[in-house]
């Protein structure tokens, strides 16, 4: 069922309840299926470098609420470093971390964010706080009216995004992300919010089967 307006009516609330139930089922099944591979990933991280297995970066959730998410640690970094699209300034990406980023495995622990209700399986991509600050006010209100997701309409353009940003560093990388990648993600996020529903979620999930689910 489509959700239509941003303010939930009784039918929309029923859709949201159904969506939450589907989120729990999918996240639970994937968590069970990935538990052994995840343990191997955790062991590889510990053997590769010192530090915790998981990192807790901040992301902006529904209605602008700040949430701390779970991801596999992929770098040795200053905990006070500023996070950007290219990573934290001064960070040193580990050998295992580089592979986890390339394969999209670093985001597997986000399944726990689905189970605890901060994320949905399908929803606009969660963004770093510094970039939410440049959202146009109208788009910000729309995109942040729903929970962020693991995958969305922009997931199918991930390869094109990586190609666009490949080889860029520092200010050039930041500029390309803010001026080219972010506006497209926001437009797709707006499309999702305005047309969201069971069938759209199903189409997005089906499209993600062509590549790694959590990339």
Could you say what each language-model-derived stretch is?
Residues 112-215:
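Hydrophobic structural segments characteristic of membrane proteins
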Residues 91, 103-106, 197:
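Residue-level signal for the nucleotide or nucleotide-sugar donor/cofactor binding architecture
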Residues 96-103, 190-194:
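Short, well-ordered beta-strand elements within core beta-sheets of diverse protein domains
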Residues 12-77, 192-215:
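A hydrophobic, helix-centered structural microdomain
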Residues 98-120:
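Short, conserved beta-strand/loop elements in beta-sheet-dominated catalytic cores
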Residues 55-92, 153-183:
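Short, glycine-rich, amphipathic interfacial segments at transmembrane boundaries or analogous
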Residues 27, 42, 55, 94-98, ...:
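Positions in alpha-helical segments
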Residues 3-28, 56-57, 82, 87, ...:
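Glycine-rich flexible loop motifs, especially short His-Gly-Gly/GGXG/HXGH segments used as catalytic or interaction
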């Amino acid at each position: 069922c489509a959700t239509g307006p941003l303010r939930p009516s009784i039918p929309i609330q029923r859709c949201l309840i159904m969506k939450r139930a589907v989120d729990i089922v999918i996240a639970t099944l994937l968590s069970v299926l990935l538990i052994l591979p995840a343990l191997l990933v955790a062991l590889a991280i510990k053997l590769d470098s010192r530090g915790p297995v998981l990192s807790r970066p901040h992301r902006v959730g529904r209605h602008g609420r700040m949430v701390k998410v779970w991801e596999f640690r992929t770098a040795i970094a200053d905990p006070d470093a500023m996070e950007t699209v290219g990573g934290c300034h001064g960070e040193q990406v580990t050998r295992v971390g580089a592979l986890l980023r390339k394969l999209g495995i670093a985001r597997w622990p986000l399944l726990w964010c689905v189970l605890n209700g901060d994320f949905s399986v399908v929803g606009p991509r969660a963004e770093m706080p510094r970039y939410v600050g440049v959202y146009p006010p109208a788009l910000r209100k729309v995109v942040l009216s729903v929970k962020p997701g693991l995958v969305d309409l922009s997931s199918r353009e991930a390869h094109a995004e990586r190609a666009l940003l490949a080889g860029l560093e520092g200010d050039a990388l930041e500029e390309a992300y803010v001026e080219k990648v972010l506006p497209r993600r926001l437009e797709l996020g707006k499309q999702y919010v305005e047309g969201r529903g069971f069938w759209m979620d199903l189409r997005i999930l089906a499209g993600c089967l062509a590549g790694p689910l959590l990339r």
